Amino acid sequence: PSLKNIFKEYCDDLSEHDPMNGDLSNWAKNGVLLLNTVLTVEESRPGSHAKKGWEEFTINSIKFVLEHQPDAGFICFGMPALRLAEKVIMELDIKHPILINTPHPSPLSVYRGFYGSKPFSRFNAERKKRGLEVVHWALPTYEQKTLF
């Protein structure tokens, strides 16, 4: 459900079509990394794999990206993501990072500010303001799918 809500906000924010097929390879080609603070979960048990080591893995992954791509930025969906990003930013002493924060897109919090938050256009506006290349967020339709 959260990814569907991200897609809805994507469509509303950027006036894009509904990607329908879930192919995010264009985002990856544009340097976008989607990463949860915890990468696995038991079905119907949110947070069931928290504090099992995933947070440290995620922190180290973000550090690796920032050490090799210092202009990388963050779109944080929810407070756990924001806290984790802020921790890495402080540890690496990054000055003036691009940090876009929204409520989490889960069904429980989507109407508490996620819808209408425009994270994609805000992220690009910040990159453009800094003279950085913007992310090309367009996603393929079924007919354009090129994964295989």
Regions found by a protein language model. Give the residues of each.
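A polyanion-binding, active-site-adjacent surface
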Residues: P1-C76, A81-N101, P105-V110, F114-Y142
